[in-house]
Regions:
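Short, mixed-charge, low-aromatic patches
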Residues: 8, 12-13, 31-38, 81
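Generic, well-ordered alpha-helical scaffold segments in large soluble proteins
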Residues: 9-13, 60, 156
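C-terminal segment of N-terminal export signals and the immediately downstream linker at the start
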Residues: 17-56
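Mature-region segments of soluble proteins
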Residues: 38-39, 49-56, 67-223
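Short amphipathic alpha-helical interaction patches enriched in hydrophobic/aromatic residues
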Residues: 61, 65-66
Length: 223
């Protein structure tokens, strides 16, 4: 199974042999490597302990393997931390008055808890997730896969893998390089003649690289 297919199926649908194969890549990632990376992160919402748990959970959702980098490599936890630190995290833009209907694929999460609370409560449910063996981590995520927290975690992991780096994730354009996305290129005319007849694909460029401008975090991420 390709990793692109994995991210669109629920954890409960995975068989035992596949779970073992997904466990192997994380076993090869030294935990000290993750700890060292987190030690230098400019966290705005998570505590260091929470960031370790979220990083480990995101890596289970999108693990590093022979096909490419994982959530840890892409700095997904930074993306999530920035989102939760800003107005999105406190539900500034979502209608939050009861009564609340059932959540659905069409309407999304329906409930009183804002994203910050969903994460804080979800992290408590996961316990010492970052120190668990991989098989136990998978079991822990299977136990919560029907919850709003897991739906949010999974969505945020994918967003952090493939967003523009200005938002905090997709470090070194690792997500775009993996899928061959060139970034927000505005015009290909200059390349047509130079590469006519070739199976050519431009190297990915971020919004800042394309425009030559520096961008500050937008209002959603400033808090």
């Amino acid at each position: 199974m390709r990793r692109r297919e994995f991210v669109i199926i629920p954890i409960g649908a995975l068989g035992g042999s596949l779970l073992r194969s997904l466990a192997e890549p994380l076993d090869r990632i030294a935990r000290v490597e993750v700890a060292n990376a987190l030690a230098t992160l400019p966290l705005r919402f998570f505590t260091a302990a929470e960031a370790r748990i979220v990083t480990a959970a995101c890596e289970r959702v999108f693990p590093r393997d022979e096909q490419g980098p994982g959530a840890t490599d892409a700095g997904v936890v930074v993306y999530i931390d920035r989102q939760l630190a800003g107005p999105y995290g406190r539900d500034k833009y979502r209608y939050t008055k009861p009564p609340f209907g059932p959540s659905s694929a069409e309407h999304g999460y329906q409930g009183a808890e804002n994203p910050r609370a969903l994460y804080r409560n979800g992290i408590r449910q996961l316990g010492a997730f970052d120190t668990m063996p991989v098989t136990e981590q998978i079991a822990a995520l299977k136990a919560i896969e029907k919850t709003p927290f897991f739906a949010l975690l999974r969505a945020h992991t994918l967003e952090g893998m493939f967003c523009d780096p200005v938002h905090g994730g997709n470090e070194n354009l690792s997500g775009w390089k993996m899928v061959g996305f060139p970034g927000p290129l505005m015009d290909y005319r200059a390349h047509v003649d130079a590469h006519y007849g070739e199976a050519w694909r431009p190297a990915p460029k971020s919004l800042e690289q394309v425009t030559g401008r520096r961008f500050a975090p937008w209002e959603e991420e400033r808090g």
